[in-house]
Amino acid sequence: MTKPTYILIRESSNESGYTAHPFPTETSAYAAMDRMMESDTAAIETTYHLSPRVEQVSSYKTQLIFDAIIAESDMTVKITYSVYAIDK
């Protein structure tokens, strides 16, 4: 039996598209997700001078949510991180 590949997907409501990164284990995918969330949180705090809230959507999906003025528009931004197992 082959081992699955774990895919970490990051998508943001204020950006087009998404990024996907493969990992050999579930643990490594979630560790990368934590680092990515820390990096995004630091960028949000530096850029917008506010702290995003974290929302656990499901066991495999987490969101950072913050309200900001982007291009002169008030908007709620959601950055979603998801980990999926893909069987080969």
Locate predicted features:
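Short aromatic-glycine-(Arg/Gly/Cys) micro-motifs in beta-strand/loop hairpins
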Residues: 1-19
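A short, charged, amphipathic alpha-helix used as a generic interaction element across diverse proteins
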Residues: 11-13, 24-52
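Generic structural detector for well-ordered beta-strands
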Residues: 22-24, 85
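Short, mixed-charge low-complexity intrinsically disordered segments
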Residues: 38-88
